[in-house]
Curated annotation (Swiss-Prot):
Protein name: Pimeloyl-[acyl-carrier protein] methyl ester esterase
Lineage: Bacteria, Pseudomonadati, Pseudomonadota, Gammaproteobacteria, Vibrionales
Localization: Cytoplasm
Species for this entry: Vibrio cholerae serotype O1 (strain ATCC 39315 / El Tor Inaba N16961)
Subunit-level organization: Monomer.
Residues binding substrate, per UniProt: 22, 82-83, 143-147, 235
EC number: 3.1.1.85
A Gene Ontology biological process term: biotin biosynthetic process
GO MF: pimelyl-[acyl-carrier protein] methyl ester esterase activity
Keywords: Biotin biosynthesis, Cytoplasm, Hydrolase, Serine esterase
Gene: bioH
Active site: 82 (nucleophile), 207, 235
Length: 255
């Protein structure tokens, strides 16, 4: 089955793909794509079920990957935010001819907390799932607030996220539920050692969804990767510290 996803392409140079997170769409990358298009050929996608791809649906990371493969550039730098980080990591693991370098942003190989592993408490994810069935617009708004919490520019961050989501068709509830299931169940920790391309992990020090301790734990699980912590950011460093964020990507691309 072919699944035509919505892509926007701008700029010239090395191919760079930007992948959004849960409940969002490609419009969250608008400022980032604009800034990076002076340095790269930037590809921004709406994942299946989101934005202008809202009529599509994918129930697993591999189904998302198959949809992306239809139009994704080969040998590109992949930048995945939050849930998009799982998507980009999956691409690097299973479709490596498409990925020359991997960047994860405020992401984790396992989002749900378990034992000593830090993350989102399973009951929070369960509550989100229950709320989603009742009122998915309100649930997305709560998630936006949760993402920005702790950031000095939280109010502005939420405003931009909200504008981005509302500027395109609302996500489909089926895909939102599938995404929450991925956040609750996917665990790529043991697979990280098999990533064969250079990897950069970017974090926000104030992030409540991907705690800073995850960055330290991953130094052991992915010792070959590089990591950088944005001091003033929560879950959306590409908004809170936009200039520094783009600088990290440009420097990593040229290394």
């Amino acid at each position: 089955m072919t699944m035509a996803l919505y892509w926007q392409v701008s700029g010239q140079g090395q191919d760079l793909v930007l992948v959004h997170g849960w409940g969002m769409n490609g419009a969250v990358w608008q400022q980032t794509a604009q800034a990076l298009s002076d340095h790269f050929r930037v590809h921004v996608v709406d994942l299946p079920g989101y934005g202008h791809s809202a009529e599509q649906h994918a129930a697993s990371l591999e189904e998302i990957a198959q949809a992306l493969l239809e139009h994704a550039p080969r040998n590109a730098i992949w930048v995945g935010w939050s849930l998009g980080g799982l998507v980009a990591t999956h691409m690097a693991l299973h479709h490596s001819d498409y990925v020359s370098k991997l960047v994860t942003v405020a992401s984790s190989p396992k989002f749900a907390a378990q034992g000593s592993w830090r993350g989102i408490q399973p009951d929070v994810l369960t509550a989100f799932t229950d709320q989603l069935v009742a009122d998915f617009q309100l649930t997305i708004e709560r998630f936006m607030a949760l993402q920005a919490m702790g950031s000095p520019s939280a109010r502005q961050d939420v405003k931009v996220l909200k504008q981005a989501v509302l500027s395109r068709p609302m996500p489909n509830p089926q895909s939102l539920l599938a995404g929450l299931t991925m956040l609750a169940e996917v665990d790529l920790r043991d697979e990280l050692q098999h990533i064969s391309v250079p990897m950069l992990r970017l974090y926000g020090r104030l992030d409540g969804l991907v705690p800073a301790k995850v960055a330290r734990d991953l130094n052991h699980l992915a010792p070959y990767s590089e990591a950088f912590m944005f001091d003033q950011s929560s879950h959306a460093p590409f908004m809170t510290e936009a200039e520094a964020f783009c600088q990290q990507l440009i420097e990593f691309a040229t290394r």
